[in-house]
Every structure is written in structure tokens, then in C-alpha cells.
Design a protein with these regions (language model features):
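Helix-loop-helix hairpin linking two adjacent transmembrane segments in secondary transporters
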Residues: 140-186
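Extracytoplasmic gate region of multi-pass secondary transporters
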Residues: 30-31, 215-241
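Conserved MFS/SLC helix-loop-helix module at the cytosolic interface between two early adjacent transmembrane helices
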Residues: 61-100
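Cytoplasmic helix-loop-helix junction between adjacent transmembrane helices
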Residues: 105-145
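Extracytoplasmic
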Residues: 11-45, 234-239
Length: 241
């Protein structure tokens, strides 16, 4: 009979799902409010491209040392610190007074958000038995599309009615609440679960989960945004071609 996951494991998994959702919600806000930021700071496409590429690069690079820390220190504390940091910096993004201030704040947001994946995946490995682990990873990864969906659904309306800075302020609030909850969550013993057998189905799920967190996947979603939100511009471009 499959081993039943304890309530503590389910509770922490829910927190990890929420952290992942906020991770992708917060990072998507600039993509939604791109036009008002462009107008206020007088930016061209080159500056916006540098901003997106720099965030992706720092996010990818910072994950390596943060993964090292997740192997040696309390992962719940690493997640709490990372979530608190990127929530503060998300709120600070709304206080940016120039493009350069916004640029450096967003780079620091990338460092904070890079703490999520290594610590969360390590926790899931110790919280769930092998026959439940792929399902737990699937629930955790559900935060990615739901975070994007939530951001594209409400950030535009908030920016239109209250200005582009307000979504950054509001996005920070739930981060502080969840950070406090994960801070005091019980840390599972490392290596307490037996290794998961490498079946074909589980390898496929792992590959999909890994790709969905990759910069290539996120970049593809952001590149697809203009065709969804501004079809008339693409239509004009197509006619010129």
C-alpha cells in the first residue's frame, strides 16, 4: 500500500505552491505594465531587452550558489529569506525614479526569486515518498502557469485604474505573510525518504518540470505576449512584410 503523506507535508507543499505562484506573478508584472514604464522613463526597445535579458541571466546564475546553501542550511529559512527579500524589492520596484533604479531593483528581485527552485525541490524530495513525489512536484509546478495567468488577468486592470506602480505594492503583501508561515514550518530530515525509482513516466514529468522553469520557457511565454495582448500591432507588421 502506498505510504500516506502526513498533514505536515501537505501543509508545506501548499506553502511551496503559493511561493512558486508569487514567484511567477511578481516577475510577470513588468511585462504587463511595459508600455507605461516605457513612456514614463522614455525607454526604447534596446533598454527593455537589456532589462529582460539581465533579469534572466542573474536569475539563472544566482540559482547555483543558492542551491549550494539549500544543501547545507535550513531550506525553510532560505525560502523565507528569499521570499521576504523579493517581496520588499517588488514593492521597491514601484518606487523607482529612473530606469537605472528600476533596472538594479529588478536584478535583485531575480536573486531573491532564484532561492525558490533549489530549496523547494529539495524539500519535496524529503517530504514525500517516492510514489507521491512526482504528484507533489506537479502541484508545486502548477504555481507557474497560475502565477502567469493571475498576473495577466489583474495587473493590467490595476495599472489602468491606479497607475503602473500600484501592482508592485500590492504584490508584496502576500509575500510577507507566506514568508512568516514557511519560516516557522517544520524542516524535514534530509535524506529521510528513499530514492525515487527512475521510471519512464517519472523521467518525463521531471523533464517537463525542469523545462517549465527554464529561462527558455519563460522567454517564450513573454515573447508570445504581444500576439495575445496587441494583435493589431502584429497585423500591421504582417502587412508591411
Amino acid at each position: 500500500m502506498p505510504e500516506r503523506a502526513p498533514i505536515r507535508s501537505i501543509y508545506i507543499l501548499i506553502l511551496l505552491f503559493l511561493i512558486n505562484l508569487m514567484n511567477f506573478f511578481d516577475r510577470t508584472i513588468p511585462a504587463v505594465v511595459l508600455e507605461p514604464i516605457r513612456r514614463e522613463f522614455g525607454l526604447d526597445d534596446t533598454a527593455l531587452g537589456i532589462l529582460g535579458a539581465s533579469f534572466t541571466l542573474i536569475y539563472a546564475v544566482a540559482g547555483v550558489p543558492l542551491g549550494y546553501l539549500a544543501d547545507r542550511f535550513r531550506r525553510t529559512h532560505i525560502l523565507a529569506a528569499g521570499l521576504t527579500a523579493w517581496s520588499l524589492l517588488t514593492a521597491a520596484s514601484g518606487l523607482a525614479w529612473s530606469f537605472m533604479s528600476f533596472f538594479w531593483i529588478r536584478l535583485l528581485v531575480g536573486v531573491g526569486e532564484a532561492s525558490c527552485a533549489p530549496a523547494a525541490n529539495s524539500l519535496i524530495g524529503d517530504l514525500f515518498p517516492s510514489e507521491k513525489r512526482a504528484r507533489a512536484l506537479g502541484i508545486f509546478m502548477l504555481g507557474l502557469p497560475l502565477g502567469l495567468l493571475l498576473a495577466f488577468s489583474i495587473v493590467g486592470a490595476l495599472a489602468q485604474n491606479y497607475g503602473w506602480r500600484v501592482p508592485f505594492y500590492l504584490a508584496a503583501v502576500p509575500g510577507f505573510v507566506v514568508a512568516a508561515m514557511i519560516m516557522f514550518a517544520a524542516e524535514p530530515v534530509r535524506g529521510s525518504r528513499k530514492p525515487m525509482p527512475s521510471t519512464q513516466r517519472q523521467r518525463w514529468i521531471a523533464r517537463c518540470a525542469g523545462f517549465s522553469r527554464s529561462p527558455r520557457c519563460g522567454g517564450s511565454l513573454l515573447l508570445a505576449r504581444p500576439s495575445i495582448s496587441r494583435p493589431t500591432r502584429w497585423a500591421r507588421f504582417s502587412r508591411r512584410c
